[in-house]
């Protein structure tokens, strides 16, 4: 999964119709892997909100689906970067924390979203890093509660089929996944890279 980011370049305009300097996207389209591009206005309204929001995804999912949502950690480990990751300014051999989670309804057990993160832990305070490693809390909530100055920059949005590797939804049937990749800038440096995927059939 980390390899997904290795061939990306800093100029992300082609994959992101939601850049702030471009204004309202209007009739923009997003890419569908292996198929025709999709006009953004055809996406369910709440999914459009999720693609552009700058806040805690867990809380907005709770408000929309009206049940508690928990972060279920599926994978978390330190790995050396095999190749450069331009979006994070990571060099080969640099140690990063990779993390894969599901955002699941506590009562329904439905997986509303899946997220994969690459984190440069050496660039965050020790207390933040330890809470992250201990899996005590989600990244968005942790940043909010830490009081650190940060902002999110959306880099890429698109639609791809679920293939069992990118984000299994535990649903009775496979679903197209609407995704966004963004990075979190802290103290002027890219520190966290996250791809969130949302099963389309749950939001239609």
Functional labels for PLM-detected ranges:
Residues 1-98, 102-178, 185-204:
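N-terminal domain-onset segments
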């Amino acid at each position: 999964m980390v390899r997904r980011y290795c061939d990306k370049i800093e100029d992300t305009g082609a994959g992101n119709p939601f850049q702030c300097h471009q204004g309202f996207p209007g009739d923009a389209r997003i890419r569908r892997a292996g198929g025709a591009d999709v006009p953004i206005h055809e996406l369910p309204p709440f999914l459009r909100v999720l693609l552009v929001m700058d806040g805690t995804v867990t809380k907005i999912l709770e408000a929309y689906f009206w049940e508690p949502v928990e972060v279920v950690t599926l994978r978390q480990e330190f790995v050396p970067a095999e190749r450069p990751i331009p979006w994070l300014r990571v060099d080969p051999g640099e140690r990063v924390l990779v993390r894969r989670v599901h955002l699941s309804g506590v009562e329904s057990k439905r997986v509303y979203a899946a997220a994969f993160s690459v984190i440069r832990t050496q660039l965050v305070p020790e207390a933040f890093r330890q809470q992250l490693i201990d899996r005590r809390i989600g990244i968005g909530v942790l940043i909010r509660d830490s009081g650190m100055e940060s902002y999110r920059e959306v880099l890429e949005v698109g639609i791809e089929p679920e293939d069992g590797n990118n984000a299994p939804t535990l649903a009775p049937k496979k679903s197209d996944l609407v995704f966004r990749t963004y990075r979190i800038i802290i103290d002027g440096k890219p520190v966290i890279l996250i791809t969130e995927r949302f099963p389309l059939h749950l939001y239609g």
